[in-house]
A protein has these predicted regions:
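Short alpha-helical transmembrane segments in multi-pass integral membrane proteins
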Residues: 1-24, 81-148, 192-245, 303-368, ...
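Hydrophobic alpha-helical transmembrane segments of integral membrane proteins
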Residues: 19-20, 58, 181, 243, ...
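Transmembrane helix-bundle signature of multi-pass secondary active exporters and lipid flippases
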Residues: 25-79, 143-150, 239-306, 326-334, ...
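Juxtamembrane/transmembrane-helix interface segments of polytopic membrane transporters
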Residues: 31, 35, 39, 43, ...
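Helix-loop interface residues and adjacent transmembrane-helix termini in multi-pass membrane transporters
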Residues: 33-36, 44, 50, 84-87, ...
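Small-residue-rich hydrophobic transmembrane alpha-helices
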Residues: 53-113, 150-169, 277-335, 339-341, ...
Length: 460
C-alpha cells in the first residue's frame, strides 16, 4: 500500500472500491464467524444447549454496547483523520489517532468496572430468566475482563482501514477469528468449560488481535503512527470525533436497547423458545449487516479523502457504486433467507422445535432486508462527508422513533402476538428507508453543490 494517499483521488473508482472493499468484506464475513461461532458451538452442547444459547443471547445487548463505545470514538475519528489527510495535514490526523487511542482505554476501564459490579442485575433486566441467568453470568463475567481488547481492536482497526490499509484490517479480524474458532471447541468441549470456555476463548482471541493492531500502528509501515506525545484527551480533538461518531454509536447501542425490548416482549408472549429464536435471528442479521458494513467501510476512505480534496464528481461516483453493490448483496441475502430459513436455524441448534419456530420468525423478521442496502449506503455517505446531524437523525428515527414503539404496538394488531413482535422490524425498516432516501437526496445534493461552488471559487 502506498504511503502517499493521493491514489484515493486518482485511481479508477470501481477498481479502488473493489481493492479496498474486498479485503474488508472478507474480514467482515470472517468477523461474522468470530461473533457467532460461540453461539454455534454453545447451541450444540449436549443436554442444555438450547438454554445455554438463550443465556448467551441475553449477553448480546451488553456485547453490542461494548462494541458501540468503540465506534463512538473511532467511527468519527477515522473519517476525520482521512479528511485531514485529504487536506495534506497528517499532523492533525496523528493527533486524532492518539487522542482516540487514549479515550478508548479510559472507556474500557469504566465499562469493565460497571459490568463486573452489576452483571447479574443487568442480565436480569435484559431478559434473563431463572432458567438462563447462570449461563449468562458465567459468560459475561469472563467476557467483561476483555473489554479493553475489544475497544482497541475495533477502534484502532478503523484507523488502519481509513488509511487505505484494507488488507491489514482484514488480517486483524482473521487473526482473532481463526484463534476463536480453534480455541472454542478446546475450551467448551475438550476442557468441559461450557459457556465459560466460550467466553475465555473469545477474550484470548481478542487479545491476540489487539496486540497485532497496536503493534502495526506503532510500526514503520503505517502512514499515521501512534506517538506518546499525542496520548492526551483534548476536547478540541475528541469532541468533533464523538459528535460524528454519535450516529454510529446510536445505531449500535440502540441495537442493545432494541434487543432488550425484543427479549422482554418475547419472554412475555412466547417464553424461552421465543428469546432463543431471537438469539438466532440476531446472529443471522449480523451475517447480513457485517458484509454490508465491510463494503461501506471500504468506500469510506475514498469518500472522505475526495470530499476533503473537493472532488465532488468522485464522491458522487463512489456513492452510486456503493449503493449498487449494497443493494445487490441485500437482494441476494434476502432471497436465501426467505427460501431456506431452516438452514440458517440449524446452524445454531439441534432442537427441532426451536428450528421450526425460528424458521417461521426469520421469514417475517427479514421480510424487507432486500432494501437495507439503501439505508447502509446513505448512512456511510453522511458519516464520510462529516454530516453528523444527518447521520444522527437517520439513526434516531429508525431505532427510537419507529422500531422501539412498534415492538409494543404490533402485537395488538395480530392474533399471534409473538410473531407480531417480530413484525416490528420490517414495518420500521420500510418507513425508515423512505425517510433516509428523502433526507439523503436533499442533503447530499446540497453538500455536493457547496463543494462545487468552493472548487470554482478556488480556481478563479
Amino acid at each position: 500500500m502506498e504511503k502517499d494517499k493521493s491514489f484515493l483521488g486518482t485511481q479508477p473508482v470501481g477498481k479502488l472500491l473493489f481493492k479496498l472493499s474486498l479485503p474488508t468484506v472478507i474480514a467482515q464475513i470472517v468477523n461474522m464467524l468470530y461473533n457467532i461461532v460461540d453461539r454455534i458451538y454453545i447451541g450444540h452442547i449436549p443436554g442444555d444447549g438450547s438454554l445455554a444459547l438463550t443465556g448467551v443471547g441475553v449477553c448480546l445487548p451488553i456485547i453490542m454496547i461494548i462494541s458501540a463505545f468503540a465506534a463512538f470514538v473511532s467511527a468519527g475519528g477515522a473519517p476525520r483523520a482521512s479528511i485531514s489527510m485529504g487536506k495534506g495535514d497528517n499532523g492533525s490526523a496523528e493527533k486524532i489517532l492518539g487522542g482516540c487511542f487514549s479515550m478508548q482505554i479510559v472507556i474500557s476501564a469504566v465499562l469493565t468496572a460497571l459490568l463486573l459490579i452489576f452483571d447479574r442485575d443487568l442480565l436480569l433486566a435484559f431478559g434473563a430468566s431463572e432458567n438462563t441467568i447462570e449461563y449468562a453470568v458465567d459468560y459475561m463475567n469472563i467476557y467483561a475482563i476483555g473489554t479493553v481488547f475489544v475497544q482497541l481492536t475495533l477502534g484502532m482497526n478503523a484507523f488502519i482501514t481509513a488509511q487505505g490499509f484494507a488488507n491489514i484490517g482484514m488480517v486483524t479480524v482473521m487473526i482473532g477469528a481463526v484463534s476463536n474458532i480453534v480455541l472454542d471447541p478446546i475450551f467448551i468441549f475438550g476442557l468441559h468449560m461450557g459457556v465459560r470456555g466460550a467466553a475465555l476463548a473469545t477474550i484470548i482471541s481478542q487479545c491476540i488481535s489487539c496486540v497485532w493492531v497496536v503493534a502495526f500502528l506503532f510500526g514503520k509501515k503505517t502512514i499515521l503512527r501512534l506517538k506518546a506525545k499525542n496520548f492526551f484527551v483534548s476536547p478540541k480533538i475528541i469532541l468533533p470525533c464523538i459528535t460524528l461518531g454519535l450516529a454510529t454509536f446510536i445505531m449500535q447501542s440502540s441495537e442493545s436497547v432494541i434487543s432488550v425490548c425484543f427479549n422482554s416482549s418475547l419472554l412475555k408472549y412466547g417464553g424461552d423458545i421465543a428469546v432463543g429464536a431471537m438469539t438466532i435471528l440476531t446472529s443471522v442479521m449480523q451475517f447480513a449487516m457485517l458484509p454490508l458494513n465491510g463494503i461501506s467501510q471500504g468506500s469510506q476512505p475514498i469518500l472522505s479523502y475526495n470530499y476533503g480534496a473537493g472532488n465532488s464528481e468522485r464522491v458522487k461516483k463512489t456513492f452510486k457504486l456503493l449503493l449498487a453493490v449494497c443493494l445487490t448483496y441485500s437482494f441476494l441475502l434476502w432471497g436465501l433467507i426467505e427460501l431456506f430459513p431452516q438452514g440458517f436455524a440449524r446452524m445454531f441448534s439441534s432442537d427441532a422445535a426451536l428450528i421450526d419456530f425460528t424458521a417461521h420468525a426469520l421469514r417475517i423478521y427479514c421480510a424487507v432486508l432486500c432494501l437495507f442496502g439503501i439505508q447502509m449506503s446513505c448512512q456511510m455517505a453522511f458519516v464520510s462527508i462529516g454530516s453528523a446531524l444527518c447521520s444522527i437523525s437517520v439513526a434516531v428515527v429508525r431505532k427510537f422513533v419507529l422500531l422501539l414503539p412498534l415492538i409494543y404496538i404490533m402485537p395488538a394488531f395480530v392474533a399471534d402476538k409473538t410473531m407480531g413482535v417480530y413484525m416490528a422490524e420490517p414495518v420500521a425498516d420500510v418507513i425508515a428507508i423512505t425517510f433516509t432516501s428523502i433526507l439523503f437526496t436533499i442533503q447530499f445534493g446540497k453538500a455536493m453543490k457547496k463543494l462545487e461552488a468552493q472548487k470554482k471559487g478556488e480556481t478563479k
